[in-house]
């Protein structure tokens, strides 16, 4: 399982750990990933995702998982999230 957010694509970054004497050694900055279960109102079921804490705040801000996925770009989403987005869009188109 990769250390990548399924909704925003946020991943591991690399940088330097700098000591007092200014020696630099490599380090990794890990994203704050959480395993969450989100409810899709359109599909009427819950979905398990591994997303960053920042993405969780964005989902809540936009009004839920469905609204977030409809607005999200395809390039940042994982394969699982892309399939969810397509399902939601199909269901919304059928309801309209």
Swiss-Prot record:
Any one biological process term the GO annotation gives: translation
Keyword Transmembrane: no
GO cellular component: cytosolic large ribosomal subunit
Gene3D superfamilies on file: Ribosomal protein L28/L24
Domain of life: Bacteria
Family listed: Belongs to the bacterial ribosomal protein bL28 family.
Annotated protein name in UniProt: Large ribosomal subunit protein bL28
């Amino acid at each position: 399982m990769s250390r990548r957010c399924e909704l925003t694509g946020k991943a591991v970054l690399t940088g330097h750990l700098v000591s007092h004497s200014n020696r630099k050694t490599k380090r990794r900055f890990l994203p704050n990933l959480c395993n969450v279960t989100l409810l899709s109102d359109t599909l009427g079921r819950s979905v398990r995702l591994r997303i960053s804490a920042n993405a969780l705040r964005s989902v809540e801000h936009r009004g839920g998982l469905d609204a977030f996925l409809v607005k999200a770009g395809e390039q940042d989403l994982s394969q699982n999230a892309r399939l969810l987005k397509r399902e939601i869009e199909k269901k919304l188109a059928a309801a309209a």
